[in-house]
Amino acid sequence: MSLYMLVSTFAVAFIITVIGVPLFIPFLVKLKFGQSIRDEGPKMHEKKSGTPTMGAVVFITAMLISFLIFSFISGEVSAATWLLFIALALFGALGFLDDYIKVVQKRNLGLTSKQKFLGQVAISILFYLVYHLNGFAETLNIPFTNIEVDLGWFFVIFILFWLVGFSNAVNLTDGLDGLVSGLSVIAFSAFGVIAFYQEQMDVAIFCFAIVGGMLGFLLFNKNPAKIFMGDTGSLALGGSIAAISILVHQEWLLLLIGIIFVIETASVILQVFYFKATGGKRIFRMTPIHHHFELGGWSEWRVVLTFWGIGLIGAIISVCVVIF
């Protein structure tokens, strides 16, 4: 019965997305909701200008419909259900506002950094309050041990760092056709298996709803992309995967399951630090690091496949660590 629920959750999200995206693309084109390409980006990306964006509206809707339907059918509605709903829906809403400013007001950077950060912090605080009021453990596991450390009120700082950090990390990674879509299929599949193994069906249902939606979206987002997810999708996915890692108490494994997100973010931080420290020198040709490989002559598809492969290895190792 449990496996049936997971397969059904996956299938419904996948089908709704596959049907919805082709219907949504002409609507976005009619409204002229096309992606603007930043001037400092790689020149080979200029051809992507005008590609419909905000496609995440479809797959987030599909995910939420499937997730809520099968959560209620299976009787697995819990506090974790609503925490995951908060992460996906509210981070998605923040991303939608950012995308709307970009495409309607033609401001390629969307919300200011301060506005986006304050929004992320507000959502993270709400997540913590619901988490705390429902009596979830405010502890962190020490990797490769059975020891848990009670953080007390410091746990709220961890929540802020984790949710804000990973929502931004996925957002930074979303720069190549299909990259984040494919990595999300891999990462959420891994957490879905872990949640199922730990008998957390509420979380597992959520994970496989996302896998279904993302696999359906990938059909249209792979190179050459017919549609982009926008910040609507990347912020929602980043916030959600951070929330899942907390709910299954495998926070540190997210660093391995989401290793590409970590590497992409680290490349930006290193580049900025080195640039300022050396008065203008660079470590990489361009960051996030996927652009470094592009400018080194790699095709976009080669970069994506390589990064998917690294993400898959990290996910497999993580699942094995938990199960074996």
Curated annotation (Swiss-Prot):
<dbReference type="GO" id="GO:0071555">
    <property type="term" value="P:cell wall organization"/>
</dbReference>
<keyword id="KW-0808">Transferase</keyword>
<feature type="transmembrane region" description="Helical">
    <location>
        <begin position="176"/>
        <end position="196"/>
    </location>
</feature>
<protein>
    <recommendedName>
        <fullName>Phospho-N-acetylmuramoyl-pentapeptide-transferase</fullName>
        <ecNumber>2.7.8.13</ecNumber>
    </recommendedName>
</protein>
<dbReference type="GO" id="GO:0009252">
    <property type="term" value="P:peptidoglycan biosynthetic process"/>
</dbReference>
<comment type="function">
    <text>Catalyzes the initial step of the lipid cycle reactions in the biosynthesis of the cell wall peptidoglycan: transfers peptidoglycan precursor phospho-MurNAc-pentapeptide from UDP-MurNAc-pentapeptide onto the lipid carrier undecaprenyl phosphate, yielding undecaprenyl-pyrophosphoryl-MurNAc-pentapeptide, known as lipid I.</text>
</comment>
<dbReference type="InterPro" id="IPR018480">
    <property type="entry name" value="PNAcMuramoyl-5peptid_Trfase_CS"/>
</dbReference>
<feature type="transmembrane region" description="Helical">
    <location>
        <begin position="304"/>
        <end position="324"/>
    </location>
</feature>
<keyword id="KW-0133">Cell shape</keyword>
<keyword id="KW-0812">Transmembrane</keyword>
<dbReference type="GO" id="GO:0008963">
    <property type="term" value="F:phospho-N-acetylmuramoyl-pentapeptide-transferase activity"/>
</dbReference>
<comment type="pathway">
    <text>Cell wall biogenesis; peptidoglycan biosynthesis.</text>
</comment>
<dbReference type="GO" id="GO:0051992">
    <property type="term" value="F:UDP-N-acetylmuramoyl-L-alanyl-D-glutamyl-meso-2,6-diaminopimelyl-D-alanyl-D-alanine:undecaprenyl-phosphate transferase activity"/>
</dbReference>
<dbReference type="Pfam" id="PF00953">
    <property type="entry name" value="Glycos_transf_4"/>
</dbReference>
<dbReference type="GO" id="GO:0008360">
    <property type="term" value="P:regulation of cell shape"/>
</dbReference>
<comment type="similarity">
    <text>Belongs to the glycosyltransferase 4 family. MraY subfamily.</text>
</comment>
<feature type="transmembrane region" description="Helical">
    <location>
        <begin position="117"/>
        <end position="137"/>
    </location>
</feature>
<dbReference type="InterPro" id="IPR003524">
    <property type="entry name" value="PNAcMuramoyl-5peptid_Trfase"/>
</dbReference>
<feature type="transmembrane region" description="Helical">
    <location>
        <begin position="53"/>
        <end position="73"/>
    </location>
</feature>
<keyword id="KW-0961">Cell wall biogenesis/degradation</keyword>
<feature type="transmembrane region" description="Helical">
    <location>
        <begin position="9"/>
        <end position="29"/>
    </location>
</feature>
<keyword id="KW-1003">Cell membrane</keyword>
<keyword id="KW-0573">Peptidoglycan synthesis</keyword>
<feature type="transmembrane region" description="Helical">
    <location>
        <begin position="77"/>
        <end position="97"/>
    </location>
</feature>
<dbReference type="InterPro" id="IPR000715">
    <property type="entry name" value="Glycosyl_transferase_4"/>
</dbReference>
<feature type="transmembrane region" description="Helical">
    <location>
        <begin position="201"/>
        <end position="221"/>
    </location>
</feature>
<keyword id="KW-1133">Transmembrane helix</keyword>
<keyword id="KW-0132">Cell division</keyword>
<keyword id="KW-0479">Metal-binding</keyword>
<feature type="transmembrane region" description="Helical">
    <location>
        <begin position="253"/>
        <end position="273"/>
    </location>
</feature>
<feature type="transmembrane region" description="Helical">
    <location>
        <begin position="147"/>
        <end position="167"/>
    </location>
</feature>
<dbReference type="GO" id="GO:0046872">
    <property type="term" value="F:metal ion binding"/>
</dbReference>
<keyword id="KW-0472">Membrane</keyword>
<dbReference type="GO" id="GO:0005886">
    <property type="term" value="C:plasma membrane"/>
</dbReference>
<feature type="transmembrane region" description="Helical">
    <location>
        <begin position="227"/>
        <end position="247"/>
    </location>
</feature>
<dbReference type="GO" id="GO:0051301">
    <property type="term" value="P:cell division"/>
</dbReference>
<keyword id="KW-0131">Cell cycle</keyword>
<keyword id="KW-0460">Magnesium</keyword>
